[in-house]
């Protein structure tokens, strides 16, 4: 079990990242790379090589496309690739609203819930019946500390977070209660 400090300062990078990394095939790592590529301020296409194809990663690609990102997966290549085509972004999340279905993908639910909180609009996430039993309250509570974010669970403390944002996020200190 990890022990984290009560406060963790996250500083913006001084310059854009220009690197190549080889990572093990993993749906969780592929989904993290997809979110990072979608949010990256890039002025060229971004290609993820060796992405793991799974239900979770296909769900994430479809959700990002629904959010307005120009993504083209090629799952049949010798090394599967996912290309993000450059598009001038006027918004962090291109779509002002979206209904996202994450099937049974817990990583997609959590990553997308946090990701859409950076956008300006209204986003609703749903999944299969089993997803509605999985807890997400800790994440919703953390997101509700952000100025302008309203993250709610439509049923119990389960899934269905509807996230509404009306203005840009402001810098500040946000905390997570110890477990």
Predicted regions and their residues:
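Structural preference for solvent-exposed beta-strand-turn elements
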Residues: 1-179
């Amino acid at each position: 079990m990890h022990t984290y400090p009560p406060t963790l300062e996250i500083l913006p990078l001084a310059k854009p990242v220009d690197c190549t990394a080889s990572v093990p095939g993993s749906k969780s790592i592929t989904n993290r790379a997809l979110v990072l590529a979608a949010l990256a301020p890039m002025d060229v296409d971004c290609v993820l090589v060796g992405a793991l194809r799974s239900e979770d990663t296909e769900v994430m690609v479809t959700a990002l496309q629904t959010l307005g990102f120009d993504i083209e997966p090629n799952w049949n290549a010798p090394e599967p690739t996912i290309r993000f085509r450059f598009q001038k972004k006027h918004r962090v999340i291109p779509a002002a609203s979206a209904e996202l279905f994450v099937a049974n993908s817990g990583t997609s639910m959590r990553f997308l819930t946090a990701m859409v909180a950076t956008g300006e609009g209204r986003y609703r996430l749903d999944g299969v019946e089993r997803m509605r039993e999985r807890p997400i309250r800790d994440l919703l509570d953390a997101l509700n500390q952000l100025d302008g974010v309203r993250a709610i669970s439509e049923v119990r403390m389960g899934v269905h977070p509807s996230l509404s944002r009306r203005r840009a996020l402001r810098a500040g200190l946000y905390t997570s209660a110890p477990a």
